[in-house]
Amino acid sequence: MRSSVALAAEARSRFAAESHVPIDSIKIALSLAAYGASLPLPHEFDGFYPPPYGPQAYVHPSADPAAPPNRNAFRADERAQEAQAEAALTAFHLERLRAYAADAQTWRSIDALAFETVPLAREVRAIRRAVAALEDDGLKPEERKPWWVCAVYTGGEFPEQQQGGAGAASGGRLAARDVLAAYFGDSDVHGEGGARYAVPDAFGVNCTAVAHVAKAVAAVSDALEETGAAAQPWLVLKPNGGQTYDMDTRKWGWYGGESPSQGDEWAGQLGDIVRAATNKGVWGGILVGGCCKTGDGELRALAKVLDSNGPTGEIN
C-alpha cells in the first residue's frame, strides 16, 4: 500500500525537475475507497454491504428469486445493528489510515486524504470517526492533512435508502439534508457518547456521470444554504466521463440512453456546474477534476473552461 505513495512522490519529483516548477506546487492526495470496493463483487455504487457492515449480503435476483429485496439501510428497529455497522466500518478505515501514518516518510509525502465513491451515510460517519481516532493517536497539528469524502450519486441520487418500519427499508433515497448531517453534524446519532467525529474540509461527488452531478450539487447546495451555517466547506467535483459501470458484467459502457460526449461537451457541462455552485455562495471554494473514463482530452478542455471562468482556488 505504501509503495503507491512512494511512486507518486517519485513522479512528483521527476515532473518538478523536468518542468522546472516548484515541487511544493504539486500535491499528492491519497485516494481511499469505500468498504464496498473491497468486496469480491464491488458494491461501492449501491452500498449493499454484508453484516457486520450492513443489514444483509447482496443476493442477485436470478440466484434466488425468493430472497428478500436487497437493502442497504437498516430498519427503524435495527438501531443497535446500525451502530455495530458504523463501528465495523470505522475499524476498516482506521486500519488503512494507520498503515500509511505508521511510516513517517510515507505520511510526509501525502498532502491530502480523499475518501471516494462512498455510498452510505453511516460510512461517512465512520470515516469521520476513523480520522478523529487517527488524530487522537498522537498526530501533531502539522501532521494533520486536509481531507474530504466524495459521495457517489448513481442515477443522480444518493444510494442509501430511507429507513422504513419493521418490515423493510423505504423505497425512497436519503435526502440531501440527511447526507449533509452525516458529513458535518456534531451529534452522535446512536446516543452512545464518547465517539468523536472529525469534520471534513469538503463535501464531494465523484464517480458519477456529469449529467447527474448538477442535480446532486444543486440539492446539496440548497440544503447547505438552509442550515445557515457560518462555516463554508469546500466542494470537490470529479465526475466520470459519461459511461456507466455494470456490476453484473463488470464492464463500462453506454447504458440507459446515454451517448458518448466529446471532451469539450463534458468540460462545458462541468464548467456550468462550477459556475452555478460558485454563484450559490455557500462553498468556500471548489476543487474540480475527473474520475473514471476521463482522459487527457477531457482534462485539457476542462482546464480551458476553468481558465475562462477564473480560478477556483485550492484547499489550504
Where are the regions a protein language model picked out?
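Domain-level signal for soluble alpha/beta catalytic cores
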Residues: 1-316
